[in-house]
Curated annotation (Swiss-Prot):
A zinc finger (UBZ4-type) spans 185-213. InterPro entries: Rad18, Rad18_fungi, Rad18_UBZ4, SAP_dom, Znf_RING, Znf_RING/FYVE/PHD, Znf_RING_CS. This is Postreplication repair E3 ubiquitin-protein ligase RAD18. The keyword Electron transport does not apply.
Length: 491
């Protein structure tokens, strides 16, 4: 036996593809249209957005905590624009109640048709051995018939001209006309006589209560129903439920397993929508407001939770998560036609906390539904807190600054030793001499004689030395300087 809880839960998962093996596979389209785009389940407390798309109230509110657009069309959405769809919720509830019955009926009819096609034409005529087995079976119900019918049966069996199939059909039709079906027969609560419900309610009950004799018409009807007594004798005794027992059959077995679990008398979706209009709105209960956690101190947040009779222990992130989740549960519950009590909502909140990593693992920094956390907010948000961001990433910034300073020092030492040197081969191709070349060589020698910058020197001294070297290097590499030098040497 598999004890995996996920396997057990999968057995209760419904999907539009369940209709494919039935006689009406196109019903999967109706099934899928009644499901939420986010959770893929049947719509619960459906709400419609300003862009005319419908989702579960819980799903879309949870989605809009982090996002600000419609999941389908990406149009901008606000939680305040969500509207209830009362009729759609009742339609979905009604369909989900009858869904298992429809599936079973369609599959059952399909299997019966396949069975009828595979049956041979001679399978309807039972053999003598089968007849004897059926007669000797203890579960087989025996129906006694009148002497006239038995004589006609013997005569028909004596003659071989009439086939058995025809005889069987005649007997079945006669017995059906003579004896009402079991569902049509009821028992008188006074004299315990079995008869039809119409006869009991119109004539028999009055005579039975007054103690008078039954009229001839009712007697004849009662005599025809007395043939049902043999069936009753072979059935187990049942307790008499009183006068209300004749409003329903004594033995009312469900047609299918799914129908036995469903009380069809409680499918009052139509009554709720048309008659119980006062239950459509919950004006006396206000929805919870959305909090701006960046402007709330921890004591203030705990005060808000305490006012809602919610736990106040935990870290700051846990407190924010707790409020957000209860905010979603509470407001989506008000969108339902059949809201739950606050006690049930708090039980759901407790179950959510037990399954959430931010509450089960200490020190976890999960940011699910945490719109107050800087990790969730965008840097372009008007409520973005720079101080919180700096505090959360202070250590990372320090390491980046340290690495940047080290790379600057390495780059400065390389520039002093290598990038200041000038390619002398290009200048020597020209017959350059004289005083300007000596001055140029002095600039180069002065640049090469400068010692590397000490690591312990201050940044101001380093910047001054580097700027002086760059200035001299620019003069030495200046094309005007080289041009003047060449002109003077040629002259």
């Amino acid at each position: 036996m598999n004890s995996n809880p996920f396997t057990k839960n999968l057995q209760n998962v419904t999907d539009p593809s369940d209709w494919e093996p039935t006689k009406l596979p196109n019903l999967k389209e109706l099934d899928s249209l009644q499901r939420c785009y986010i959770c893929k389940e049947f719509l619960k407390a459906p709400v419609i957005t300003s862009c005319n798309h419908t989702f579960c109230s819980h799903c879309i509110r949870e989605y809009l905590i982090v996002n600000s657009h419609c999941p389908l069309c990406k149009a901008e959405q606000f939680e305040s624009n969500l509207k209830r769809v009362i009729l759609l919720e009742e339609i979905v509830l009604c369909f989900s109640k009858f869904r298992p019955i429809l599936l079973e009926l369609l599959k059952k009819e399909e299997s019966n048709e396949a069975y009828d096609k595979n049956r041979s034409p001679f399978s309807e005529i039972p053999s003598k051995d089968e007849d004897s087995r059926k007669r000797s079976s203890p579960d087989q119900e025996v129906i006694e018939i009148s002497s006239d019918e038995s004589n006609s049966l013997e005569l028909s069996e004596a003659s071989n001209d009439v086939p058995k199939k025809k005889i069987k059909a005649e007997i079945n039709s006669n017995s059906r006309n003579a004896i009402p079906t079991r569902n049509e027969m009821v028992e008188c609560p006074i004299c315990a006589e079995v008869m039809s419900a119409d006869l009991l309610q119109t004539q028999h009950i009055d005579y039975c209560l007054s103690g008078k004799s039954q009229p001839s018409s009712s007697r004849s009807a009662g005599n025809s129903s007395s043939r049902y007594q043999s069936m009753k004798r072979r059935q187990p005794n049942k307790t008499n439920n009183g006068i209300s027992s004749f409003f329903k059959p004594a033995d009312n077995k469900p047609i299918m397993a799914g129908a036995g679990k469903l009380d069809l008398s409680k499918t009052d979706n139509q009554n709720f929508y048309f008659d119980e209009v006062s239950k459509h709105h919950h004006n006396d209960i206000k929805k919870l407001p959305k909090l701006d956690f960046s402007s709330l101190t921890t004591p203030k947040l705990k005060e808000k939770l305490s006012h809602l009779k919610l736990p106040v222990q935990g870290t700051r992130i846990q407190l924010e998560l707790r409020y957000n989740q209860y905010y979603i549960l509470f407001n989506s519950n008000l969108d339902s036609n059949h809201p739950l009590s606050e006690k049930v909502l708090k039980q759901k909140l407790n179950q959510w906390e037990l399954s959430h990593s931010a509450f089960t693992n200490q020190g976890s920094t999960s940011t699910l539904f945490n719109n107050g956390s800087p990790a969730v907010k965008s840097i372009t948000d008007k409520n973005f807190s720079v101080k919180e961001w700096l505090d959360a990433n202070r250590n990372e910034y320090k390491s980046l600054v340290k690495a940047a300073r080290a790379s600057i020092k390495k780059a400065s030492t390389k520039n002093v030793t290598s990038s200041i040197s000038i390619d002398t081969e290009a200048i020597n191709t020209h017959s350059v001499g004289g005083q300007h070349l000596n001055e140029r060589s002095e600039y180069r020698s002065e640049a090469n004689l400068i010692e590397p910058i000490d690591d312990g020197a201050s940044e101001e001294i380093q910047q001054n030395e580097i700027s002086n070297l760059n200035f001299k290097k620019d003069i030495a590499n200046s094309p005007l300087f080289v041009k003047d030098t060449l002109n003077e040497s040629h002259s």
